[in-house]
Curated annotation (Swiss-Prot):
GO terms for molecular function: ATP binding; lysine-tRNA ligase activity; magnesium ion binding; tRNA binding. Belongs to the class-II aminoacyl-tRNA synthetase family. The lineage of its organism: Bacteria, Pseudomonadati, Campylobacterota, Epsilonproteobacteria, Campylobacterales. Its EC number is 6.1.1.6. One of its GO terms (biological process) is lysyl-tRNA aminoacylation. It comes from Campylobacter jejuni (strain RM1221). This is Lysine--tRNA ligase. The gene is lysS.
Amino acid sequence: MFDNILEQQRIEKAKELKNLGINPYPHFLEKEMSLKTFKDRFSYILEQVEKRDESVNAVVAGRLKLLRIAGKSIFANIEDEDTNLQIYFSKDSVGEELYTILKKNLEVGDIVLVKGFPFVTKTGEFSLHASEVKLATKAIVPLPEKYHGLTDIEQRYRKRYVDMIMNAEVRKDFLVRSKVVSLIRHFFENKGFLEVETPMMHPIAGGANAKPFVTFHNSLGVERFLRIAPELYLKRLVVGGFEAVFEINRCFRNEGMDLTHNPEFTTIEFYWAYHNYKDLMDLTEELFALLLDKLNLGKTIEFDGKMIDFSKPFERITYKDALCKYGGLDRDLIEDKEKILTKLKADGFEANEKLELGHLQAELFDNYVEEKLINPTFVIDFPISISPLSRRSDEDSQIAERFELFICGRELANGFNELNDPLDQYERFLKQIEAKNAGDEEACEMDEDFVNALGYGMPPTAGQGIGIDRLVMLLTNKKSIRDVILFPAMRPLKSELKEKE
């Protein structure tokens, strides 16, 4: 560890500082303000003739990103989480002894505490004239080169801390993510929703069609499943009397990783008694309007080279109409299992003859429709067979009162009128068991306790989930989900695999 020559040189400098009575890792140093506050508060000197205010004695801190020695003075650039600032100090300003120590031992990457006053250099740069410089942390590992930075995409994800040091835009993206979560939370609180927390380990893998992660509870001697969705617990709370609930938390799905999928991801799920899925679509449009406004993004945003228009009401189109309009498929084809199988095979897609009509229609949708839904589009009225927890339509028993929101070819939200008939729910679970026995690893398990809860009566309720990660991708124009997750899942390095062997 820390065995390359540059790291060893820095370790020696840290030892030398200790020998001089300077702790390279002091337990506490207090700064007065951020660099942004310093710039904002003292910007008035830019309008003054003197271009300086020596009555100020401000204390700031930051990481050294640039260090330039010019004879008896040093110019440096420090950076905190918001911005950067040039600092200047000399033998005269900090004293010859300290100046000599700093000149010899300070390096790019070190974190310093600086006290001084604002001034403008001869070249016109707003700066801090330091009277005191203290080492807050000695960096042992050198930063990547300024102009090359951390360019290997895998290394950026594995060493997110270095990525954030080197790329201010990365920090900005995660500040946006934090703000998005905060805005969503306050949006629902202001609508009268109650935020709750439900279990992360489930006795039954339920709430969505997905393959779970399995763990083992040693004390109880039973298997547990990391949750794939909080849905069934949130609906139990509606049964219990909470009429509007939401949860922002993690879900886990033991499936593939790609540009839009990470095995660990964040969602908001919310349930609203005495409302229907049309109310949820209205609520979703209102939420998007709020986010675009508070993030100052305007009514049209760019994502992956495409312009997305939020100025108009979101399109609402039925599942079957979308197959025809966007998929270019004939109405008689989408209603005929054999014709669908023939079409899929002819176009080189997998065609499982064991699938029933609704699942085959879903194959058509995935392959011919989804990527063409660029502007915000609610696709409504899904096949009932692929919607095991949704309420059946009163007009058509093969249709679920369900929608999904698509933007730029990606699903961002899924909502529906909740199934509250316990007998119907029980039958749906039995069909899911049949599907699992036939080889569908993602089919739901039977959850008799949930059916029992419905037996006590759940009021007419609508529920929805929104993927926070994909939403942030959209709002920050990022193509990969790993760009909006601080520490995304990564494949093991070869060295890690060898150690296990």
